[in-house]
Amino acid sequence: MQALTVRPGDADSLAVTEVDEPSPGSGELLVEGLALGGCGTDREIARGSYGWAPPNRDRLVIGHESLGRVLKSPQAGDFRRGDIVVGVVRRPDPVPCGACAIGEFDMCRNGRYTERGIKEIDGYGSQRWTVSVDYAVKLDPGLADVGVLMEPTTVVAKAWEQIVRIGERSWFEPKRVLVTGAGPIGLLAAMLGTQRGLDVHVLDRVTD
């Protein structure tokens, strides 16, 4: 099958290449890729300034903003053939830091996490991919057209979560918010702010 791969550190290596078909292990889903998002991190990897290949490999399948349809699932569990899913990007440090040990591996303190399509694990940029059921998120079928935005939306949701955690240490009743930057993350942040009932303002630089 075909996949979008790169040699991390090599700015001229991005290519569609042939890779082996994935074989799901115990507790894994086999997924047909439907859509793949690209962001600034992917551009950095393609430029050769970021990214790490899996151990003993020189190429990495990129892509961490995923959307797919389940082709095969374990008999037991919540997933079924045809489900629309996205894959979680990060995996915790196998010798966990304090944050990883309590399940907050998005806040890993020692940097020994791995990430699909970024750091030492192939990403979701292939025709088919596998993912553990523990790192798959099932979406409502009505979100199929926008589901590829789930991963960047989680980045924004985490930012809001941290804002609320800090604010609620004392009296906290925000009325308005300023979002600096009108890229994908900034626009998603503005949308979530509006969803919270806030008066949202977005600031960006115009260079044209």
Residue ranges, per PLM feature:
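Adenosine-nucleotide cofactor-binding segment
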Residues: 173-182, 194-208
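NAD(P)H dinucleotide-binding glycine-rich loop of Rossmann-like/cofactor-binding domains
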Residues: 94-177
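Glycine-rich beta-strand-centered segment in the early N-terminal region that forms part
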Residues: 22-36, 50-98, 140-142
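Glycine-rich Rossmann-fold phosphate-binding loop(s) that bind the pyrophosphate
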Residues: 152, 181-184
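Cytochrome P450 core scaffold surrounding the K-helix E-X-X-R motif
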Residues: 41-47
